[in-house]
Amino acid sequence: GLDDYYIDRDKILPGPDGKLDLEHINTIDTDLFRHDLKRLLAGEEVELPSFSFKLGKRVWKGHKLKLERDSVIIVEGLHALNPVLLPEDIAPNLVFRMYVSALIPLNLDNHNRIPTSYLRLLRRTVRDYETRNSPVQRTLSMWASVQRGERRWIFPYQENADVIFNSATLYELAVIKKHIYPLLTAVEP
């Protein structure tokens, strides 16, 4: 996934507001990603990086990959549709782009729908807490920046997708409640 190509957190320059913009495309080592992708497509073995969210830096674990004949590469991550990731010499007909998002189809009543951003926030809060060692308060305080990043770096490229896949399920809020409720009730108002 593209998360493993994050640059070390201490090398990220703060934005005009003095805060780190972790949604910016420049947080991804696009040069290394393109280099590794070209080597994989050329049939070479590549040692893939791994990003430690606990340490805030890239680590090398010796995970090597070499494609078999007729293999498919799946690039997963927020910036996967951004054209800057693809080397110019990759033929467009060899690339199939899929935009995956939780497009929740639920309404509170006849006039008020549940915004898709709510489900994304709930998902991210649980993910950050369980897999990135991030307190709930940190995720909540970053949400405005995340949404700015979506508007600037994600949504403009969804039109590049060949297909859009809705990853939400009708019962998801009921399932996620078990995980999110204890986290949110522990947050100080």
Residue locations for each model-derived region?
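Short beta->alpha connector loops
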Residues: 78-81
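Structural recognition of the conserved hydrophobic beta-strand(s) that form the central parallel beta-sheet
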Residues: 72-76, 99
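Conserved nucleotide-sensing/catalytic segment adjacent to the nucleotide-binding pocket
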Residues: 7, 12-59, 72
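Conserved NTP phosphate-binding and transfer environment spanning the P-loop NTPase/kinase superfamily
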Residues: 84-189
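Glycine-rich phosphate/ribose-binding loops and adjacent secondary-structure elements
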Residues: 59-67
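Short loop/turn elements that form and flank the Walker-type P-loop nucleotide-binding site
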Residues: 67-69, 92-93
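Short acidic, glycine/serine/threonine-rich loops at helix termini
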Residues: 9-14, 62, 86, 110-112
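Phosphate-binding active sites in nucleotide-utilizing proteins
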Residues: 1-4
